[in-house]
């Protein structure tokens, strides 16, 4: 053991601590150092370190490192200097003790001089900002708005009194005018009234409830309080609402990027818990009920914090009407309501409810043959009957103000509907025909995940850029595919090529995907409300769009008739007769048989290859699963034993029948590649390019006409349906 001496913390030989890169957050611990074999004593309130001479720096080394940096000087006090002097006096070598004392006095003089400079700088800062609120309250900061004036948005400022932050955000996003639902609901929401609002899809409901919450947040004096919570039925919609509100508040987010926070499943709960601890975070929360309930049940403090909100929003609230949906949401209301009642001098929060559909009839299964309506009183509207149902689940501050921006139409007038009648096994062919003839961005909805996977593989085999999203995919993969789809769509729009997104009903509600021209219902949806929300993915804002149903004769006789009757306006119902054929109220999409016939062979090959790919992939998965289960149980699994299970054997045989051998698969792929190289021609014309009604040679040279079909003019599904409607009107006259 070497001789032990008393030393300061700066005289010790500290070792740097390397923090592993795998740690997500260091919790503020940066530049850590450690030392072993040092005793710590507290004498008269002063900390002393007793270490061996080997652990203490040499005099020259310590004099260089001991010179305090700016931050250390600011924090050093007289007690530290006195402690250093006492330790110096305890040194054995008295002859050399005078030099450190001189150095100590010189350093002390420098510290005092720099401290004076720091104090003078602080005084200058205080003179520049005399009001403490300016330094602490983010929302009271005077933001430079020289480029934007309230006169630039008279469509907003003439109706409601908004902050400059909101006006600037709306101006940057190009929202110069209010939509009908915004005009009707925002003034009432700013007054603190409970609202139940109904408007067609794509009509601006997000801002109708978002702006009142943003205004409350800006005017709030408490920067740590959550002002509003927005609940959405799907994760994708929650992400979209969050981005939309963040774009409006982009100026405020420069100071605090986590002010508007999304809390959804499928993403790291640890990261969300960490973000909630940051000062000023989660002023506005956009959440799905499952993840929100998980967070508040783990943390009582979070529950108390969220119980003090000003506004509670339910987006796409009609889902609460469906029995068995969102038990988590009812638990959330009980938890928050219980704490809210215990708080003194706090009235109940403001509740805003919005959706495109508020009718209990719309939730009935279309396959159900019953045509009887709910037993509502004659004077009671659909929204009033829905409100009665909601009041059993939700506590309102007062009776909600009911706002219906489109009382007559259930489907937006900007959506042109159409029907394709085909055999049940020809849905794929007609999908291929539609995206070939009408290139652009198309969203196809299927009722099952297997159909989504198969149709995606089928279109990819035909050389079409296709992407898929469904509930079996992880949240990250869904968002990635949406981003890829949007990027590819912007590229293909210039080239005249189709871009397709195939989805299950996970994408039906609320998702605002830019530039969707067509929505195709590969299957007829199970309920009318799903049809409304699916079709509403097109014709967003002021744009127009097309919704096409692919329907078999069996569906046309039952579910389609019921769907069209439920979607009919009151005027249409009053004029109808008992034997009215409701399926004929939607126009048929014109089909060009010559083009369809050219697509039939390549469609059949692509279908067989797609079925092989899915079946072989599924067989591999099943085999791996069985082997893994057998290994975990310590059992030897033979193929003979697998065949003894009747269900497994049937399932396996069904998939085996869809698979192809290597040579057959190779041959079919080669044949399909050859067919795809053959251009599709209008009227099957192969010679005399300059003859006929259309000069094909001239069109080819001047790059006019259809991108995918030779001799065909550029067509747009929207214009085709508009022309068909106008021709029908002329015939009736």
Swiss-Prot record:
EC number in record: 3.6.4.13
Keyword Glycosyltransferase: no
Domain Helicase C-terminal: residue ranges: 428-594
Ranges where the record places region Disordered: 53-132
SUPFAM superfamilies: P-loop containing nucleoside triphosphate hydrolases
Catalytic activity: ATP + H2O = ADP + phosphate + H(+)
Molecular function GO labels: ATP binding; ATP hydrolysis activity; RNA binding; RNA helicase activity
Domain notes: The Q motif is unique to and characteristic of the DEAD box family of RNA helicases and controls ATP binding and hydrolysis.
Protein name: ATP-dependent RNA helicase MAK5
Gene name of the record: MAK5
């Amino acid at each position: 053991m070497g001789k032990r001496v008393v030393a300061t913390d700066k005289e010790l030989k500290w070792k740097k601590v390397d923090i592993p890169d795998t740690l997500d957050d260091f919790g503020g611990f940066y530049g850590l150092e450690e030392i072993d074999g040092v005793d710590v004593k507290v004498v008269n309130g002063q900390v002393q370190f007793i270490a061996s001479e080997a652990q203490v720096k040499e005099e020259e080394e310590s004099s260089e490192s001991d010179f305090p940096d700016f931050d250390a000087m600011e924090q050093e006090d007289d007690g530290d200097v006195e402690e250093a002097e006492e330790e110096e006096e305890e040194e054995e070598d008295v002859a050399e003790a005078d030099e450190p004392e001189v150095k100590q006095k010189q350093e002390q003089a420098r510290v005092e001089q720099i401290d004076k400079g720091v104090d003078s700088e602080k005084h200058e800062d205080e003179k520049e900002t005399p009001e403490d609120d300016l330094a602490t309250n983010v929302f009271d900061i005077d933001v430079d708005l020289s480029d934007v004036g309230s006169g630039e948005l008279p469509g907003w400022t003439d109706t409601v009194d908004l902050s400059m932050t909101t006006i600037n955000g709306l101006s940057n996003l190009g929202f110069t005018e209010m939509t009908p639902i915004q005009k009707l609901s925002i003034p009432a929401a700013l007054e603190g009234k409970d609202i139940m609002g109904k408007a067609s899809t794509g009509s601006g409901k997000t801002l109708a409830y978002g702006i009142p919450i943003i205004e409350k947040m800006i005017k709030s004096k408490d920067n740590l309080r959550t002002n509003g919570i927005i609940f959405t039925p799907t994760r994708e919609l929650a992400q979209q609402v969050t981005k939309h509100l963040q774009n409006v508040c982009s100026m405020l987010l420069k100071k605090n990027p986590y002010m508007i926070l999304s809390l959804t499943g499928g993403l790291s709960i640890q990261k969300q818990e960490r973000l909630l601890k940051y000062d000023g975070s989660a002023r506005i929360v956009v959440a799905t009920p499952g993840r929100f309930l998980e967070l508040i049940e783990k943390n009582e403090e979070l529950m108390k914090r969220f119980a003090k909100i000003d506004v509670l929003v339910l987006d796409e609230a009609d889902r609460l009407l469906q029995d068995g949906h969102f038990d988590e949401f009812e638990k959330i209301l009980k938890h928050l309501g219980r704490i809210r009642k215990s708080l003194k001098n706090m009235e109940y929060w403001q509740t805003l409810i919005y959706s495109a559909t508020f009718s209990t009839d719309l939730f009935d299964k279309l396959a159900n043959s019953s045509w009887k309506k709910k037993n509502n009183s004659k004077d009671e509207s659909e929204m009033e009957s829905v409100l009665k149902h909601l009041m059993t689940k939700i506590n309102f501050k007062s009776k909600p103000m009911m706002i219906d921006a489109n009382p007559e139409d259930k489907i937006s007038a900007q959506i042109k509907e159409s029907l394709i009648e085909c055999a049940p096994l020809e849905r794929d062919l007609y999908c291929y025909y539609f995206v070939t003839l009408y290139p652009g961005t198309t969203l196809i909805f299927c009722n099952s995940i297997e159909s989504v996977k198969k149709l995606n593989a089928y279109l990819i085999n035909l050389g079409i850029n296709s992407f898929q999203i469904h509930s079996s995919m992880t949240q990250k993969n869904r968002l990635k595919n949406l981003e890829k789809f949007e990027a590819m769509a912007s590229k293909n729009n210039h080239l005249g090529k189709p871009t397709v997104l195939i989805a299950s009903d996970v994408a039906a509600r609320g998702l605002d995907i830019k530039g969707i021209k067509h929505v195709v219902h590969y299957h007829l949806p199970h309920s009318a409300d799903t049809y409304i929300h699916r079709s509403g993915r097109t014709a967003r804002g002021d744009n127009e769009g097309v919704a096409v149903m692919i329907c078999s004769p069996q569906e046309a006789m039952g579910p389609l008739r019921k769907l069209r009757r439920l979607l009919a306006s009151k005027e249409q119902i009053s004029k109808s007769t008992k034997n009215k054929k409701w399926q004929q109220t939607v126009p048929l999409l014109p089909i060009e048989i010559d083009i369809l016939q050219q697509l039939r062979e390549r469609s059949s090959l692509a279908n067989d290859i797609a079925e092989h790919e899915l079946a072989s992939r599924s067989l591999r998965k099943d085999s791996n699963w069985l082997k893994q289960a057998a290994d975990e149980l310590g059992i030897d699994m033979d193929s003979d034993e697998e065949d003894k299970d009747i269900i497994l054997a049937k399932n396996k045989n069904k998939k085996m029948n869809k698979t192809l051998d290597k040579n057959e698969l190779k041959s079919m792929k080669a044949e399909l590649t050859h067919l795809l190289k053959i251009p599709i021609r209008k009227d099957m014309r192969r010679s005399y390019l300059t003859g006929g009604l259309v000069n094909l040679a001239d069109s080819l040279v001047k790059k006019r006409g259809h991108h995918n079909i030779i001799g065909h003019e550029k067509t747009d599904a929207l214009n085709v349906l508009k022309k068909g409607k106008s021709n029908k009107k002329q015939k009736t006259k």
